[in-house]
A protein has these predicted regions:
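Short "lid" loop at the C-terminus of a central beta-strand within the Rossmann-like core
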Residues: 134-135, 163-166
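Well-ordered beta-strand scaffold positions
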Residues: 27-29
Length: 166
């Protein structure tokens, strides 16, 4: 069997779709996940901590979920701020497909699940919420942060959770 990671663009592992119950914006919902994505069996502890400790997002603007996986952060942002555009960014095409599927199931039309190069270069973000892909390595993670943090607008904030020393 081929070896891959959740940060592989096209995972070689079997998709193995599954349905899990997770809290999104204060209510329990059932969402789709799959093998070859980050934490396919449950909402991971880091994301849970992030979602439980961030303030209510602004009502509108462009928001970024960097390293979105199957979408719990992006879906929470989109639910809490229906007038916002939520950019769910990942390299993993399987994860992006799951975000789209989950957003459709929840009736969220304000989620854009895309690769980094599909985000228009002139978009400035009102907030960034992320459980970044730390397993890509320290140098690549720093590159991600140096790429996206300057795209915060002047009224913005960023909320990140990391479970390892960087």
């Amino acid at each position: 069997m081929a070896s891959d990671h959740y940060f592989s663009a096209t995972p070689a592992s079997p998709e193995k779709l599954r349905r899990i119950r997770v809290p999104i914006a204060g209510r329990e919902v059932t969402l789709s996940t799959a093998g070859g994505t980050f934490s396919p069996d449950r909402l991971d502890a880091g994301t849970s901590v992030l979602l439980g400790n961030t303030p209510t997002p602004p009502p509108a603007g462009d928001f970024l979920d960097l390293g979105c996986g199957w979408g719990p952060i992006a879906l929470t942002l989109a639910t809490l701020s229906p007038q916002a555009t939520v950019w769910a960014v990942d390299v993993n095409e399987r994860a992006l497909s799951l975000v789209r599927r989950n957003a459709d199931e929840l009736g969220l039309e304000n989620v854009r699940a895309v690769t980094a190069d599909q985000v228009p270069s002139d978009v400035k973000f009102r907030t960034i919420w992320s459980n970044p892909p730390i397993r890509v390595g320290k140098d690549e993670l720093h590159n991600l942060l140096e790429t996206w943090m300057p795209r915060l607008d002047e009224r913005s904030d960023a909320w990140l959770v990391v479970q390892r020393n960087l």
